[in-house]
From Swiss-Prot:
Activity regulation, per record: Activated by calcium. Autophosphorylation may play an important role in the regulation of the kinase activity.
Domain of life: Eukaryota
Organism: Arabidopsis thaliana
Residue ranges constituting the Protein kinase domain according to the UniProt record: 66-324
Active site: D190 (proton acceptor)
Chain intervals for the UniProt region annotation (Autoinhibitory domain): 330-360
Homology family: Belongs to the protein kinase superfamily. Ser/Thr protein kinase family. CDPK subfamily.
Region: Disordered, residue numbers: 1-36
Chain residues that bind Ca(2+) 2: D416, D418, N420, M422, E427
Positions bound to Ca(2+) 1: D380, D382, N384, H386, E391
Catalytic activity: L-seryl-[protein] + ATP = O-phospho-L-seryl-[protein] + ADP + H(+); L-threonyl-[protein] + ATP = O-phospho-L-threonyl-[protein] + ADP + H(+)
Encoding gene per record: CPK24
Lipid attachment in record (N-myristoyl glycine): G2
Protein name: Calcium-dependent protein kinase 24
Length: 582
């Protein structure tokens, strides 16, 4: 749900979540958008934030105890501020989560669970310390240790050289965090480099895990089917919707792979491509700098990225591996500037895209929401407040969109967050908002204008530098060359400026900008998972590249997934899940 960051925007760079089949029946406060039927239904959707997010009484007097200062970071749900305890003058970080940003019951549960888990975890040098929580009518406030040393990748690229020994030290720290989590019955579920910050700017600063917004409690042998996480770091069994704590070892293995070579092991330009690459599990150990990497390191990465969770190394086995156990003795040979360059480009491009997303995120006017509501009403022929499969299918036909039944089924599965087989107005509107936000050129135009300071229809290098300097990515950190590299990559015709078409092409390649919306990515990855089940487990059994685990095969037979190989819907100008394309 965010972090105690003292660096720019946090969130999944890729990443970064779907239909939930609950393991418990605990009552929950609904926080989804509500339509006020006493008003003109076509006027607007009225969002009613929950009156209480945290289950137990929490003090609402944060401003009596703390002075909130400058902004440290910003994510999809909250803004992190420096805060000072009035009585002691001690500095902390305060994450303010606006209730207006919590658009679904799932979002509310994420906040509740994050607080509960941070209270449960013990004090540990590599886990950010949680102090206390507050709640008032507008927001939830999480007060925790402040981390001012920057992100893991920032520290790597700022050093003059980078070695295998440094990667071993980082990997050991991450695995020790995973061990503590598992010992206390917690699966992290979203391990990625940007969820680790250094406590301060010194060379001896501790690396700390700072975000538990997607973590969950587990019991021995318990399995989960909710798709969460950031695609590049997601284990194959998550996509197959049957997983346990083993997924954290996989994610740590992906991080280690990136630390050693600078790029993710599974890469594609679409979410579907990434998912298939993960399931296929083909890992490249041939390209530079892998020939320089020790056999022990490569062996460890392979065993952490074992596609079978039951033969994958456990966290304890990884920590006992000689390369990790003797991290201080790992080769100290420079892996080359190429690794640092790749990591820096990877980092800055993601931040550029996420800055665009921040601008896009708040630009959806009430008039467009009203249009979505009107569309729902048109489709809801029996006026019972829910869309059945038939109503959605027939409604799409009425507005000129003839969609195959399989794709309609996929859409239903993606949007039906309570799993009752129908779409409420809340579910339809919430998903539509997020998909529209990600696919609409009009919103990208608004973001483009933010960078085009002189209004000449192009983004020039100096304009990009100024915009990214706002996020501490420019001159202050000596990143001029990296910004030039980004500019060169985006400027496809090499005329020294970025047109809107080039800007749009950048934003619609890769997945990170789309996956930054948690609701969007949950729905999208769920739909992809259903599709992959059908492709991998047809009537004749699993294909050759499928994982043939008994539990996964049993689970697959329970799914009634569409046969179609693509999903691309456009409901008028309002609904276009652009990420679901072949």
């Amino acid at each position: 749900m965010g972090s105690c960051v003292s660096s720019p925007l946090k969130g999944s760079p890729f990443g970064k979540r779907p239909v939930r089949r609950r393991h418990s029946s605990n009552s929950r406060t609904s926080s989804v958008p509500r339509f006020d039927s006493s008003t003109n239904l076509s006027r607007r959707l009225i969002f009613q934030p929950p009156s209480r997010v945290l289950p137990e009484p929490i003090g609402d007097g944060i401003h009596l105890k703390y002075d909130l200062g400058k902004e440290l970071g910003r994510g999809e749900f909250g803004v992190t501020h420096e805060c000072i305890e009035i009585s002691t003058r001690e500095r902390f970080a305060c994450k303010r989560i606006s209730k207006e940003k919590l658009r679904t019951e799932i979002d509310v549960e994420d906040v509740r669970r994050e607080v509960e888990i941070m209270r449960c975890l013990p004090k540990h040098p590599n886990i950010v310390s949680f102090k206390e929580a507050f709640e008032d009518k507008d927001a939830v406030y999480l007060v925790m240790e402040i981390c001012e040393g920057g992100e893991l990748f920032d520290r790597i690229v700022s050093r003059g050289h980078y070695t295998e020994r440094a990667a071993a030290s980082v990997a050991k720290t991450i695995l020790e965090v995973v061990k503590v989590c598992h010992e206390h019955g917690v699966i992290h579920r979203d391990l990625k480099p940007e969820n680790f910050l250094f406590s301060n700017g010194t060379e001896t600063a501790q690396l700390k895990a700072i975000d538990f917004g997607l973590s969950i409690f587990f019991k021995p042998a318990q399995r989960f089917n909710e798709i969460v996480g950031s695609p590049y770091y997601m284990a194959p069994e998550v996509l197959r919707r049957n997983y346990g704590p083993e997924i954290d070892v996989w994610s740590a293995g992906v991080i280690l792979y990136i630390l050693l070579c600078g790029v993710p092991p599974f890469w594609a330009e679409t979410e579907e491509g990434i998912a298939h690459a993960i399931v296929r599990g083909n890992i490249d150990f041939e390209r530079d700098p892998w020939p320089k990497v020790s056999h022990e390191a490569k062996e460890l990465v392979k065993n952490m990225l074992d596609a079978n969770p039951y033969s994958r190394l456990t966290v304890q086995e990884v920590l006992e591996h000689p390369w990790i156990r003797n991290a201080e003795r790992a080769p100290n040979v420079n892996l080359g500037d190429n690794v640092r360059t790749k990591i820096q480009q990877f980092l800055l491009m993601n931040r550029f895209k996420k800055k665009v997303l921040r601008i896009v995120a708040d630009n959806l006017p009430n008039e467009e929401i009203a249009a979505i509501v009107q569309m729902f009403q048109t489709m809801d022929t029996d006026k019972n407040g829910h869309l059945t499969f038939e109503e959605l299918r027939d409604g799409l036909k009425k507005i000129g969109q003839v969609v195959p039944d399989g794709d309609v089924k996929m859409l239903m599965d993606a949007a039906d967050t309570d799993g009752n087989g129908m779409l409420s107005c809340d579910e339809f509107v919430t998903l539509s908002i997020h998909l529209k936000r990600m696919g609409c050129d009009e919103h990208l135009q608004e973001a483009f204008k933010y960078f085009d300071k002189n209004g000449n229809g192009f983004i020039e290098l100096d304009e990009l530098k100024v915009a990214l300097c706002d996020d501490k990515l420019g001159h202050a950190n000596g990143n001029d060359q990296w910004i030039k590299d980004i500019f060169f990559d985006v400027d496809l015709n090499k005329d020294g400026r970025i047109s809107f078409d080039e800007f749009k092409a950048m934003m619609k390649s890769g997945t990170d900008w789309k996956m930054a919306s948690r609701q969007y990515s949950r729905a999208l990855l769920n739909a992809l998972s259903i599709k992959m089940f059908k492709e991998d487990f047809g009537d004749n059994g699993p294909k050759s590249h499928s994982m043939e685990f008994p539990i996964a095969r049993k689970r697959a037979k329970l799914l009634d997934a569409p046969k179609n190989k693509s999903m691309e819907l456009q409901i008028s100008k309002t609904y276009k899940p652009s990420g679901l394309r072949n």
